[in-house]
Design a protein with these regions (language model features):
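Short loop/turn positions at the edges of beta-strands in beta-sheet-rich folds
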Residues: 57, 168, 244, 382, ...
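Extracellular, surface-exposed repeat/solenoid domains
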Residues: 159-160, 300-303, 307-391
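Generic recognition of long tandem-repeat/solenoid scaffolds
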Residues: 109, 195, 202, 217, ...
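Sec-dependent, cleavable N-terminal signal peptides
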Residues: 1-25
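Acidic glycine-/aspartate-rich tracts in secreted/extracellular proteins
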Residues: 34, 132-133, 317-319, 342-346, ...
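Extracellular beta-sheet-rich ligand-binding/adhesion modules
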Residues: 24-328
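Short, composition-biased motifs enriched in small/polar/acidic residues
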Residues: 389-465
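Short, surface-exposed terminal/edge motifs of secreted or surface/virion proteins that either
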Residues: 62-63, 147-149, 361-367, 433-439
Length: 465
């Protein structure tokens, strides 16, 4: 949605970590106005990277530019203007008495310190980049929880209209008592970060990128819905833990390039349209398919049969399966099965295993298989082996086509559909006669010949002895 804008801001702000430490001041706003206006500050200077900003009661300071500060306090108000950026470097962030209005279109608030003290309110774009905070009490984690039971405001419902990004060392934990979080754009969970949506609802309208760990340790409360695509990136310590919750739901595609795992009754519900794919296979307790999804990777279900209310799409060009582990007994069919083919045409004797389980039950409300050449038929073995097969023999004969590129002539035909045919040739200036001979390599389409204009005419045909 606005991911590029956020990362551009972070690139610019990275230089703030190396700012000079030779000056630090406590600067007070004496009048309401724009942050960039030196006339509203008692020092005659705008608060900077190493300064604290005192906003007294009755004062409203509007951040109308890219501002940076260590700490904001007192009982006044800070208002974000459209497309402005406020970066807060100190661990104490914003005093709980200070009001922050951060909903203007395109604005971004960045916390570089301890996210525990970040203001729990509504934002447009929100960034946690906890890069300069170290927990002084080992062996606790090197990050603090945000918006959980121990937060100064307690668990608080929040709306982030744009994107929310957590990088560095940040832990987000939604407490119960209605601490729902609604994100209108993308959610980016960086390496070394954890998002635990325990006890409340998490809604992301657009895409979710998981580089750290996404989990829900209290699946009995709340639900989690992602309207766009979910991408799980490679991670040695993170991934997507679907354990202890049956209420993960996706409206787009799932791309798994890292670990997805879970035990018990953890499940993902695929409610929209897309593809389940990635460089890594998926192993989770079970899935629900309510929408239309192409199976683009192998999915192993550890404990429970899938709930198939929507449409499953398998492509014969791939070998992906839905596997139900031994010991979990029956895999039950329902919904619609649509088998397509983007690869070579099936031939008699081919078998395609789509499902792998100890036992099979139920039935699809409808099935659709790719068309076959005349004489071939599909055999539906789904109820016994989770597979479909091709039987019969092709009738008719292939049609040879030609194309020329420079001095190369290419002959093509459906050699997979019509096996056994080969190219024969004869050279004869007087026309076609009976002296056909094998070309040797012309047994599989395509067959390419070099044209020599100095030679007599050459004729080609397909033959099946």
């Amino acid at each position: 949605m606005k991911t590029k804008q956020i990362f551009t801001v972070l690139t610019i702000l990275s230089g703030l970590l190396f700012a000079s430490m030779n000056r630090a001041a406590d600067i007070t706003a004496t009048n309401s106005g724009n942050w960039s206006d030196t006339n509203i500050w008692n020092s005659g200077t705008v608060p900077g990277t190493n300064d604290d900003a005192d906003i007294p009661l009755g004062i409203n300071v509007t951040v109308n530019t890219n501002a940076s500060v260590q700490f904001i306090y007192d009982s006044g108000t800070v208002t974000m203007a459209p497309n402005s950026t406020l970066t807060i470097l100190g661990d104490q962030a914003i005093d709980k008495l200070t009001s922050l209005v951060a909903t203007a279109t395109g604005n971004t608030v960045v916390y570089l310190g301890n996210p525990f003290f970040a203001r729990q309110c509504n934002y447009y774009n929100l960034v946690f980049a906890n890069t300069n905070y170290v927990d002084p009490y080992p062996p606790y984690n090197p990050y603090q929880n945000f918006n959980n039971f121990s937060s100064s405001q307690g668990p608080t419902p929040m709306t982030v209209a744009g994107n929310m990004t957590v990088i560095g060392y940040t832990k987000m934990q939604q407490g119960s008592a209605g601490a729902d979080i609604f994100i209108g754009g993308n959610l980016i969970i960086g390496t070394n970060c954890i998002w635990d949506s325990s006890g409340a609802n998490l809604t992301v309208v657009s895409n979710v990128f998981i580089g750290g760990l996404l989990e829900d340790l209290n699946g009995a409360l709340g639900s989690n819905y992602f309207g766009g695509n979910v991408t799980v990136n490679p991670s040695a310590t993170g991934g997507w833990n679907v354990s202890d919750v049956t209420q993960w739901a996706i409206g787009g595609s799932l791309t798994n390039n890292g670990p997805i795992f879970g035990v018990g009754y953890g499940s993902i519900s695929f409610d929209g349209t897309g593809i389940i794919t990635g460089s890594k296979p998926i192993t989770i307790p079970t899935i629900t398919v309510n929408g239309t999804y192409t199976i683009g990777t192998t999915i192993t279900l550890a404990t429970n049969t899938p709930t198939l209310n929507g449409t499953l799409v398998f492509d014969l060009a791939n070998t992906n399966q839905i596997i139900l582990n031994a010991g979990t007994n029956w895999l039950y069919y329902s919904g619609i099965l649509d088998v397509i083919n983007s690869g070579a045409a099936p031939v008699a004797g081919n078998s395609y295993k789509l499902f792998n389980a100890p036992n099979y039950g139920g039935s699809f409300t409808s099935t659709s298989f790719p068309s076959l050449p005349s004489g071939l038929n599909w055999v539906d073995n789904l109820a016994t082996s989770g597979s479909i097969a091709v039987t019969g023999s092709s009738t008719g004969s292939p049609i040879i086509t030609l194309s020329r590129s420079g001095n190369l002539l290419t002959l093509s035909w459906a050699s997979t559909t019509f096996p056994g045919y080969s190219v024969q040739a004869q050279t004869n200036s007087a026309g076609i006669r009976s002296n056909w001979s094998a070309t040797g390599s012309g047994t599989v389409s395509p067959y390419t010949i070099t044209i020599n204009p100095a030679n007599p005419p050459v004729f080609f045909r397909l033959s099946n002895p």
